[in-house]
A protein has these predicted regions:
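Conserved Walker A/P-loop ATP-binding site and its immediately adjacent core
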Residues: 57-79, 88-90, 94, 113, ...
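Conserved helix/coil segment N-terminal to the catalytic DExD/H
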Residues: 42, 49, 90-133, 141-147
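Pre-Walker A (Motif I) flank of P-loop NTPase domains
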Residues: 30-36, 57-58, 106-108, 168
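Walker A/P-loop
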Residues: 31-50, 60-63, 172-175
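Conserved catalytic network of the ASCE P-loop NTPase/AAA+ motor domain
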Residues: 52-54, 76-78, 100-105, 124-129, ...
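Post-DEXD/H (motif II) to motif III coupling segment of the RecA-like Helicase ATP-binding lobe
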Residues: 120, 127-177
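Conserved pre-motif I regulatory segment
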Residues: 1-39
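Hydrophobic positions in the central parallel beta-sheet of the AAA+
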Residues: 36, 61, 84, 110-112, ...
Length: 177
């Protein structure tokens, strides 16, 4: 198995980790839940993308913005990491095709909107797959008190309880207080 710094170099082109990244990655690889609060531009995404490549199974990334999902998936696929997104921008046929490919473990990382988590079809898919990690990107959206709050984030806990084996949970934000 590749080491974390080898994954960093091969897929992201960096020689070394930034401050705080390796500690978060190590904790994830040791199967600990983590919360990463890092400034914008500090490399939060690498903190879950590197372990996602190294862990067996699929990493689900709960993300609030379709544009962010598309950007991340495009960047990952260009780097050679198979990734997809499941959100309202897909037609039903595209969604079904993406799920079918995911069932074959085509993807290491799948970005999903929080509204999708408890849908019957997605929940059924998630239960039959090996979900190694669930990552909450832009985790400040979980807070009921914030202006960015999305009620469906409250279903993450319920979603995790539905999994046959509890995945690692990671959450990242630049704006938690």
């Amino acid at each position: 198995m590749m080491k974390d710094y080898e994954v960093l170099k091969k897929y992201f082109g960096y020689e070394s980790f930034r401050e705080g990244q390796q500690e978060l990655i190590t904790n994830i690889l040791e199967r600990h839940d983590v919360l990463g609060i890092m400034p914008t531009g500090a490399g939060k995404s690498i903190c879950y993308q590197v372990p996602a490549v190294m862990l067996e199974g699929i990493t689900l990334v709960i993300s609030p913005l379709i544009s962010l999902m598309k950007d991340q998936v495009g960047t990952l696929n260009e780097a050679g990491i198979r990734a997809a997104y499941l959100n309202s921008s897909l037609s039903y046929a595209q969604y079904r095709k993406a799920l079918s490919l995911a069932r074959g473990y085509t993807y290491k990382i799948i970005y999903v909107a929080p509204e999708r988590l408890m849908s019957d079809e997605f929940l059924s898919f998630a239960k039959e797959m090996k979900i190694s990690m669930v990552c909450v990107d832009e985790a400040h959206c979980v807070s009921q008190w914030g202006q960015d709050f999305r009620p469906h984030y409250l279903h993450i806990r319920e979603f995790l309880k539905e999994m046959p084996q509890r995945p690692i949970v990671s959450a990242f934000t630049a704006t938690a207080t």
